[in-house]
Amino acid sequence: MSSWFQRKFNNFESFVIDVIFGRAEGTAATLFAGFLQVLSFLFSGVVQARYWLYRTRVFHDQPLGCLVVVVGNLTVGGTGKTPVVEKFARALRDRGRKVAILSRGYKSKSPPLWRRALNWITHAAEPPPRIVSDGQRVLLDSEHAGDEPFMLASNLPGVLVLVDKNRVKAGMYAIKKFGCDTLVLDDGFQYLPLKGSLNLLLVDKTNPFGNGNLLPRGILREPIKHLKRASYVFLTKSNGQRDLDLEDLIKRHNPRADIIECAHRPKHLVRFGAGNGTGGANEIEQQPLDFLKNKRVGAFSGIAVPESFEKFLRDLGGKIEFTRRFLDHYRFTSDDFSSIFREAQEKKVDFIVTTEKDAVRIAADMPCPVPVYYLRLEIEILQGAADFNEAVERICFPGAAALP
């Protein structure tokens, strides 16, 4: 793909995302939004038909004979799912469960189309799931694993991480080959072929359901009424103040689900260093959060909601001299970094800051004429901590309480 075409495609994709999230203005945005509304109506019909087929048992979900924890959301965009998956998987591991995280590996590098077509024509055996981590070591880089699976594998020793679009196949593989007794489906709320024991639904408190429309006019993957399938609802990105209207809406659709409020808290800064052989950040230096105070910094990110990352930096006292925003899961090029470092040197910043998710997409041997740090986040339960602990106990000791 030529650089010109790639640039035009990225610009168009950015425009579409801005229309969906309500950030784009002008006549072109209004006309395009009308077109997307028609597509949204068609998409809604497909979603409803699919759920009806599973509900009426025309299509069947498949139990795998072990505990299956589903973590997902109703919307696209950054609800902060990965830190919740990490917190839950770590708690399960620490309580003695043999945990496997199953991910589809969004935007990971797959075999070329011709190879997949040839396998289909020749009826070749399906390849096994890609093993990102066997619990002992990380085996794939972020390009082949996907950003989130690579992050989870790096941060969770003792937890198996598998990537495959067929999560039933991946789950069976984890059970048979590794003896796993607990499966965690990352971004699995819409994955109906595998029956979940417990459904954890994440809702971004700062933008719960967008404009209320389904894709592609809005950010909803399925109707709001499907809140009813959740066992627990995690309100992420909370500022600690209760939103009674949102809680009432959730309870109206799902009176049984416990609501747990949580916030993403900065933990520390990690300096990006020389290669570790797999790509991504090598933790050669950590700095406390007050290291940012009154520092002149540049910021770049390729995430769904860059505003939240930039707000963290400002709230911690950083003086942002420039920002670069890329598309979610964007693969940075050497030209991108040449431009970023050039601006950083021109504006005499002390260092550059990015997100942990973006750091895993940087070549490990990239020279850094200006220091580069990533901001490590962790999840903090603000309200409903007892409910979170109860959820873990119900999974670890299912005999103590019936699963919903």
What are these regions (language model features)?
Residues E343, V349-F351, K357-P404:
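Generic C-terminus detector
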Residues K267-R271, G275, P288-S334, E393, ...:
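Redox- and metal-dependent alpha/beta enzyme cores, enriched for Fe-S-associated oxidoreductases
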Residues K8-L67, I395, G399:
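A transmembrane-helix-recognition feature enriched in membrane-embedded lipid enzymes
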Residues V70-F88:
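Glycine-rich phosphate-binding P-loop
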Residues Y173-K176, D187-K293, G298, E310-K311, ...:
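Conserved catalytic-core segment of NTP-binding enzymes
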Residues L42, T82, L152, D186, ...:
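Residue-level signal for inorganic ion chemistry
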Residues K87-V159:
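N-terminal phosphate/diphosphate-binding loop that engages ATP/GTP or pyrophosphate donors
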Residues M151-K195:
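Phosphate-binding/switch loop-helix module in NTP-utilizing enzymes
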